[in-house]
């Protein structure tokens, strides 16, 4: 399958993408420890960590109910079509949305619509700073304790999440003999913003091949050295070759899981939305964590072409050049 890296504009000679495999998370947790030493070693080696049922089930279910209500009020459907509803799974497959407006050319929402809908994906960015999502993920004591144990105590105060991302099932028949069914949906990419630590929290159960978040294990080590600076978006001339190497050589893993599971990953990881062959909706909240330091203003981000209002990942005013130790400044349980 031909590689297209969505956030980097890579479209060159075809690369055969590897099919993803469903990840089986090892039980490395230790009672009373936000992150065990075994989990730290796993994160350093692989670039991600799955914390099972980190968020209380009741809180997650309440958040999903509020998300459904917001979705029903805010996402327009094509004329004459049925909107998805939480109590009727027959309405979930291949929804038909109304035409999406162009993003604003200026102002606080410059460059990205407040709600993105197209194909089988809806991104409720505008919901990202809602109190119930802030309390559920970046400001949740257990979530923040994990982020502090991995990255550091001095985290930048969280201002928003990226919102809720929903991946809807496909109404079309899938040929079980088509090998492309496990590679075609993958869109490996990295994000063009300041990146240190990210989190993905599931708002509902995500079965295998149900659109689970997908990463390329170990790619954080390769992509870290494809940048000039440790955290700021600063690709070197060999950046695109590094992405192509990751996609060609690394087998991606897909995260199936339960509501309340949270996946933490290093910000330089190559990642993708997952393969969705099922009949459920994958609901997830995405959040960003960085150490607390002076960052550029919104206008400065716009001037350098790195303004992404829906991400809580601001470019540092000063950032260290990439050196031998990619974990310089990270706590890593110490």
Please annotate each region the language model reported.
Residues 70-73, 153, 206, 222, ...:
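Phosphate/oxyanion-binding loops and surfaces in catalytic or ligand/nucleic-acid-binding neighborhoods
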Residues 189-208, 256-259, 264, 288-292:
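Short, conserved beta-strand element in jelly-roll/cupin
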